[in-house]
């Protein structure tokens, strides 16, 4: 049990360190944050000043019917980019939420960049 608590503390410390470095998302450049569960992948774009979610996307959405793998997460990035372009948002702050920048996280960020979003 002690190892689990130490790992949780390290994760919280890592998240805080990343958030301190990237700053807050504002209306001109909102923050996109990632969450991975064992089964699903979630991303949401947040304006931290207002405290409002501007756009979100996840593999749990029935109309998308995607799984949690790199190719589907890239499609998820393209869907989010389209939703952001509809709202005239072209610049984001990328918050990897303590996850390593590889695999699903890197694929998602790459898909956003390829779709024309400045991350």
Swiss-Prot record:
GO terms for biological process: translation. Keywords: Ribonucleoprotein, Ribosomal protein, RNA-binding, rRNA-binding. The keyword RNA-binding applies. One of its GO terms (molecular function) is 5S rRNA binding. The keyword RNA-binding applies. It comes from the Bacteria. Pfam families: Ribosomal_L18p. InterPro entries: Ribosomal_uL18_bac-type, Ribosomal_uL18_bac/euk. One of its GO terms (cellular component) is cytosolic large ribosomal subunit. This is one of the proteins that bind and probably mediate the attachment of the 5S RNA into the large ribosomal subunit, where it forms part of the central protuberance. Belongs to the universal ribosomal protein uL18 family. Part of the 50S ribosomal subunit; part of the 5S rRNA/L5/L18/L25 subcomplex. Contacts the 5S and 23S rRNAs. This is Large ribosomal subunit protein uL18. It comes from Borrelia recurrentis (strain A1).
